[in-house]
């Protein structure tokens, strides 16, 4: 039996990152809404509890509290951001509105030699104070410590940025240790989970495979499953996992909606029919999809339409399978949280995902989402453990709506053709260009990354079609053609991301090739936006 961490979600967009960090420490955890019953908390029997952040205010929303059982169990508790504030309020402290709200990078001074922060620091001040580089996101602040607590961290604008009652194992921080922007955040969470809570690091991917296979078999029984195969990492790993569980009860439906990458259909059929020996039905539905997208410019509507058409195609195929009762999808955690579809339903919706937002309530098939609680890097790890080839597992993510969300505004077949060719050139150049010692010296990559392709050094890269024209000169003639933007990001979890600092020579080659080889394009720009504030996809 694995030790378990209970994460209570108050509605933060990054609650799932807490789970990711706990799992990186090889400790099992589950996320549940903050308003679960006291009986649930006791029956879960956690070794420790973590309280997440929230977009709410502790003194405006008096219902958003942790169950009393959290404080009665006698296990360590870690409060993060809002979790710190509700801990303070519920245990007799004081929270008030801050005159100076903090959103973004901050430097926090550590105090008091607590077990949580002992020997963890990023730098020291000339006065010898240990400092932490962290990520803040709060409008309220703790103004008075609860009885039994001592100060653990502070900033000039947030005098109580961390507090601890070590006798009871209660710790709280105003910043977010779960995000990558907090330099020592992973170390702090490991200290809490392994050191303070005493959890055994014995949860590994092979355990997850066994549990997932058993769960799929229990859910599905002898019924049949259809899965929408896109060729992307998520649907590929979902197909492999489900195929391991139920074999030929799974039928993969590969839908060509006219918005796929170059040569996608050929690659998908070779991989799944040739390698996995899975049942794959190939459907060309490009006319159907493009017809319904004609004249539609709103990105939310495009996603909804693509999701709806996918469902209709699946339902039509399911009718041919007498025992098909399940629709499987490669939905992963970032899809769910960006759609406001976490287990708590409290996260603010950023955009609809075709996997979750596009499904009608009247869907005639039950939904099977075996990757719903996994992050992208976990999905890749799972794929390797399932024996999938590296070229499949480490392929860059591709959204279910395909080029439909990479063509701004109305989707047209000729726009898709232009974008497909530009995107293929960009990816080809990334694959064949290796990082050099000069790149490392310039700070574009780490020294141990020299010799790796820039495709492998980026987490996701693609081209975006902009439906605007600009003036250009080709030879002796004037051109008036379309623009494409190149986008490349680096991230570990896809919840936050940095734009990739690619070598200028590489970007120059991409631009020259695209303009010279793709008739109809005469300008190439590079996107230097991070996430946040931008999302990775443009729509």
From Swiss-Prot:
Pathway: Purine metabolism; GMP biosynthesis; GMP from XMP (L-Gln route): step 1/1. It catalyses: XMP + L-glutamine + ATP + H2O = GMP + L-glutamate + AMP + diphosphate + 2 H(+). It is an enzyme of class 6 (ligase). Residues 4-202 form the Glutamine amidotransferase type-1 domain. GO terms for cellular component: cytosol. The lineage of its organism: Bacteria, Pseudomonadati, Pseudomonadota, Betaproteobacteria, Burkholderiales. It comes from Cupriavidus necator (strain ATCC 17699 / DSM 428 / KCTC 22496 / NCIMB 10442 / H16 / Stanier 337) (Ralstonia eutropha). NCBIfam families: guaA_Cterm, guaA_Nterm, PRK00074.1. The active site is at 81 (nucleophile), 176, 178. The keyword Chloroplast does not apply. The keyword Ligase applies. HAMAP family: GMP_synthase. It comes from the Bacteria. Keywords: ATP-binding, Glutamine amidotransferase, GMP biosynthesis, Ligase, Nucleotide-binding, Purine biosynthesis. It holds the Pfam family GMP_synt_C. This is GMP synthase [glutamine-hydrolyzing]. One of its GO terms (molecular function) is ATP binding. Its EC number is 6.3.5.2. Homodimer. Residues 203-395 form the GMPS ATP-PPase domain. ATP binds at residues 230-236. Catalyzes the synthesis of GMP from XMP. PANTHER family: GMP SYNTHASE [GLUTAMINE-HYDROLYZING], GMP SYNTHASE-RELATED.
